[in-house]
Amino acid sequence: LGLVPGAGAQIEALRTAVGDTPITVAGKPYPPLLQETINRMQARRPVFVGDRLDTDIEGAHNVGIDSFMVFTGAHGKTDLVNAIPQQHPTAIGWNLRGLLAPRREASWHDDEVLCRGARAYVYGGVVRLDGPLITVDEQLDALWAIVQLTWRDGSLDAADALDALDQLP
C-alpha cells in the first residue's frame, strides 16, 4: 500500500469543511488521549512504542514520556536523522523485541560518538563510520551514533554513512 493518510488528514479535511479549528484533538500527537491512557493504566514508567516520528514519538514527547522507535513501519533512518527535536525518540530498536535488549547508550568523546561497537565522527562536514555493520543491531548502533551528531549539527552530510546501513529502511 505504501504511505496512507492518517487521522490528521481526516481532521484537517473536517476543519476545512466546517471552517473552524477543534478546541481539543484526542489523537496522536496531542496529549489528551495519551495522558488518559497513562492515567487509566496507572503507568509509572510508560514508554510509547511507534514507527511514526510525527505522531507516536512526538506524542510521547508532548506528554513527557520515553519513546521507542521501531523500524518496521512508516519512518526510517533518513527520517530519524532529519527529525525535529520533539520527534527525537529516547531509544530505537528494530522491532518490539528491542524493548527486551539493553538500551543503546551513546557517549561523546571529543567530536565523535560511540555506541557499543560503532563510532561516528565528522571529517570535513561529512559523517563517517567505523565499526562492524554486518547485523541489524550493529547498524542500529551506528545509526544511534550518527543521529547524536546530526541532531547537534543539522548541516552535517550523513548520506554516505546512512547508505552503509543497508539493512535499515
Describe the predicted segments one by one.
Residues L1-P169:
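Asp-based, Mg2+/Mn2+-dependent phosphohydrolase catalytic module
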